Amino acid sequence: SSHDRMAAYINHFEKNDVFNSSAVAYYCGNRGVLTLDESDNPKDKALMDRLARIIQARRYLKYGIPMKNKTRVVAHRGFWHTDGSAQNSIASLLKADQLGVYGVEFDVWMASDGVPVLNHDGWHDGYEVQSTPSTVLTTLKLENGEPMPTLAQYLEAAKDTKVHLVLELKPHATPEAETAAAEAVVKMVGRYGLSKRVTYISFSLHIMKELARLAPAKTQLMYLGGGTLPKDLKAMGLTGCDFNYGVYLNNPTWLNDIKALKMASNVWTVNNPADMMWAIENRVDYITTDRPDLFLKLTRK
């Protein structure tokens, strides 16, 4: 019966506590239960990997069995998926620290008066961030009622936390503006004594090249765009690749390339437990997620 076939699949899956795709059986039309190495369809492995991760994620979440994990979690724009918090707020930083994540990602723009401020989008409440002075921007409210923070305020709060800081410097209107922003940010991070606790990321290759020039030696520098080969990023002086989940799926050799180059890997923005498990299984170094609480539930006792 179909029930017996499904039971055979589940029994085989649970027998292998750590997921091993080559050992998973599945039902294929009237052909009964097959193992993946018997399939003549090249898409079967990817399909079964997806299904098995879904089942395994539910099992871990339901029974509280932690996964074996070396992947570190970064809270995307802080831990804002909780009461009293908001994206890129100081509360989201403090709540992420209380949650026990490895790192907190946040977004930085340079206001028109040269003051770095935190915001994701280029506009907030009708004001273009890089064309507006910080004296105006800091009167604007976030969703939790906090004013838009300056980078100085954020770093001051971060001094009393243990989290690693993942600073995304947003692309600006001109290369000159990007250089000025990179110089201001690196200088400010150094002034607060946090240089060893900061990773810099950006979608702008110009910004990343400037950060490679400006940041202290051994600073983690990771590019967010997916259109440049890892080896070319390393040649620019970058130390890691911070790619969207889809980029890794579309370029299946890149993770191994990154490891061979002795670069760090990060995947974003992964909120689905099955996709989180993909990152863990593939030994991605860092995962950026809006649900760090869910990731920790998967991986902690």
Residue ranges and their predicted role:
Residues 2-47, 275, 283-287:
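Substrate-binding cleft of secreted/luminal carbohydrate-active enzymes
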Residues 45-301:
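Phosphate-group recognition and catalysis centered on beta-loop-alpha active-site segments
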